[in-house]
A protein has these predicted regions:
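Sec-dependent bacterial lipoprotein signal peptides
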Residues: 1-27
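Beta-strand-rich domain onsets/edges
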Residues: 29-39, 188-197
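Acidic/polar, low-complexity intrinsically disordered N-terminal segments immediately downstream
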Residues: 30-135, 298-344
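Sterically constrained small-residue positions within well-ordered secondary structures
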Residues: 35-37, 66, 108, 182, ...
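Tryptophan-paired
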Residues: 71-131, 212-298
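Short, low-hydrophobicity acidic/polar segments
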Residues: 87-194
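Acidic, serine/threonine- and glycine-rich low-complexity intrinsically disordered segments
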Residues: 147-256
Length: 344
């Protein structure tokens, strides 16, 4: 009788242990770990404040300012050492915030971790990007003009210095130390982009402007590009910037002038900055004048406002056969026609 009772107790205890074990293990199996979310939203705010001759420091309000209106942002995430690109995306969804600034928003799929992030406006016409997938080597540069244009200034530009179009403004955001924590839902990265291109106002007086049909300028000794991830100008090699000029006046005096873009003046440059004006007359003549304006870049007007105001005067003699051809239109209403008046 005792042995029967003892066997029954052992059987009951074993059954209880089995039930308890099943509860424990089934409880563990039904609590899966949550996966980390890779969704990240990038918000890039375009800040155009303080760009001389574009959003401030306008010397001549008769001259249209360069347009800065990005439509697409190219966003890249590099590994934390700045090596390989981990992921990239193109974001085009944009809206205007309460301060009137354009904000781009878009999502990328990237694992939590430490990265370097770069974003710039994609699709500029005259500003190109070289080696976009290298953090330290990605650079913006300007498109070279055709040889037929460059040859007109071959004796006016230092040997080996390419003649390029003025670069379009390129807005860049860089985050060299961006950490994405483990998260669920959407992690948000906010950044701000600014232009790596500068705008200057150039002006010279012309006696006999009515006899001029078109005018172009080439400014040599300028920075040739910008390392966009580092925010550093490229001063070696240098380049010469080519741009068109418009007719206007300064307090009633006839002038030719332009707001032009450049990657800037080389750091510490005190000489070698020359501008050549190439004017075509109504009777088919070509008049070229070159001026050293190194000192103008050191003037208060240039340092504070990016104004290059030459005191010199270019004199254009009347045509030998008056009445042929026509000069500049007396207004700047036909800006679109005049702005690209370069023989190609």
């Amino acid at each position: 009788m005792r042995s029967l009772r003892h066997g029954f107790l052992k059987l009951a205890l074993g059954a209880a242990l089995c039930v308890l074990s099943d509860c424990i293990f089934s409880g563990c199996e039904r609590r899966p770990l949550e996966d980390q979310d890779f969704r990240t939203r990038v918000q890039v705010r375009v800040n155009l404040d303080g760009i001389q001759n574009v959003t401030c420091d306008i010397y001549n309000d008769k001259i249209p300012v360069p347009e800065i209106d990005p439509e697409v942002m190219h966003v890249l995430f590099f590994d934390e050492n700045g090596g390989a690109v981990v992921t990239e995306s193109y974001i085009s969804s944009r809206e205007t915030d309460q301060d009137g600034k354009t904000v781009f928003r878009g999502e990328v799929s990237v694992a939590p971790g430490s990265y370097r992030m770069l974003a710039y406006n994609f699709g500029t016409e005259t500003t190109q990007i070289r080696d976009p997938y290298g953090w330290e080597t990605s650079q913006a540069y300007a498109t070279a003009v055709p040889e037929s244009v460059a040859s007109k200034f071959v004796t006016k530009v230092p040997s080996g210095e390419p003649v390029v179009y003025e670069p379009d403004h390129l807005v860049v955001a860089r985050e060299p130390d961006e950490y994405i924590p483990p998260h669920t839902g959407v992690h948000v990265i906010e950044s701000e982009c600014r232009s790596v291109v500068e705008s200057y106002y150039l002006q010279i007086k012309v006696d006999g402007l009515q006899y001029v049909s078109s005018a172009t300028a080439v400014l040599s000794g300028m920075s040739s590009g910008n390392y966009i991830s580092l925010g550093q100008r490229i001063d070696d090699p240098q380049s010469a910037v080519c741009f068109s000029l418009l007719k206007s006046d300064d307090k009633g005096e006839p002038v030719i002038c332009a707001i032009f873009n450049t990657f800037g003046r080389p750091e510490g440059a005190e000489n070698g900055l020359e501008v050549t004006f190439d004017l075509r007359t109504t009777d088919g003549r070509t008049v070229q004048k070159t001026f050293d304006i190194s000192n103008l870049f050191l003037s208060e007007n240039c340092i504070k406002h990016h104004w290059l105001l030459l005191d010199e005067v270019i004199k254009i003699d009347p045509p030998e056969n008056p009445g042929t051809g026509g000069g500049f239109d007396p207004s700047v209403d036909d800006w679109d026609d005049e702005h690209h008046d370069i023989d190609i």
